[in-house]
Amino acid sequence: MFSTSAKIVKPNGEKPDEFESGISQALLELEMNSDLKAQLRELNITAAKEIEVGAGRKAIIIFVPVPQLKSFQKIQVRLVRELEKKFSGKHVVFIAQRRILPKPTRKSRTKNKQKRPRSRTLTAVHDAILEDLVYPSEIVGRRIRVKLDGSRLIKVHLDKAQQNNVEHKVETFSGVYKKLTGKDVVFEFPEFQL
């Protein structure tokens, strides 16, 4: 029998906490006795968090390594369904573990000789988190509303075709995104007018 830490690989050799071990154990059980065995065997996670998303609801965020994100997304719909059964209806979302590098300033520019890649910028990482969050639905547009006090509200338009699948999770998505990035976001399913 594998240990519970088999499915979780933390950076710098840190030990997973109790909650992460629970998630890891759940993934192991799924791997043992479901038809997802072949796909799950190669995959692991880097971290897991449980957060409050308004009205006393909780959501589970599972962080996965960026190179494995595509493989997770192939089985994500079924994986999420199974995990939500196990964790009594808490919404589960998968997000890739990305790093944001600080903006080079005049002082820090000399230290790192390499240019900061676009994928490590704050904007790119926040956009990518949004894409991961709403998978399997797609973002078809966004509007940013700047209020008079300078605060921003991002309106994200999702694909109408997926409305039935993700509509009940929209509040969770907003809560998770606010927690991870500090940005307010509202999801909509607009009718398209040409």
UniProtKB/Swiss-Prot annotation:
Any one GO CC term of the record = small-subunit processome
Disulfides per UniProt: none
Q: Name the keywords, alphabetized.
A: Cytoplasm, Cytoskeleton, Nucleus, Ribonucleoprotein, Ribosomal protein
Q: Where is the signal peptide?
A: none
Supply the InterPro entries for this chain: Ribosomal_eS7 (IPR000554), Ribosomal_eS7_CS (IPR047861)
Question: Which Pfam families does the record match to this protein?
Answer: Ribosomal_S7e (PF01251)
Gene Ontology biological-process entries? ribosomal small subunit biogenesis; rRNA processing; translation
**GO molecular function terms attached to this record:** structural constituent of ribosome
* Entry keyword annotation includes Ribosomal protein: yes
* Main localization (coarse): cytoplasm
Compartments where located: Cytoplasm, Cytoskeleton, Microtubule organizing center, Centrosome; Cytoplasm; Nucleus
Q: Does the keyword Nucleotidyltransferase apply?
A: no
- Binding partners and assembly: Component of the small ribosomal subunit.
Family in the record: Belongs to the eukaryotic ribosomal protein eS7 family.
Which PANTHER family does the UniProt record give? 40S RIBOSOMAL PROTEIN S7, SMALL RIBOSOMAL SUBUNIT PROTEIN ES7
Its biological function?
A: Component of the small ribosomal subunit. The ribosome is a large ribonucleoprotein complex responsible for the synthesis of proteins in the cell. Required for rRNA maturation.
Name the chain's protein. Small ribosomal subunit protein eS7
Q: Which species does the entry assign this protein to?
A: Xenopus laevis
User: What is this organism's lineage?
Assistant: Eukaryota, Metazoa, Chordata, Craniata, Vertebrata
Primary gene name: rps7
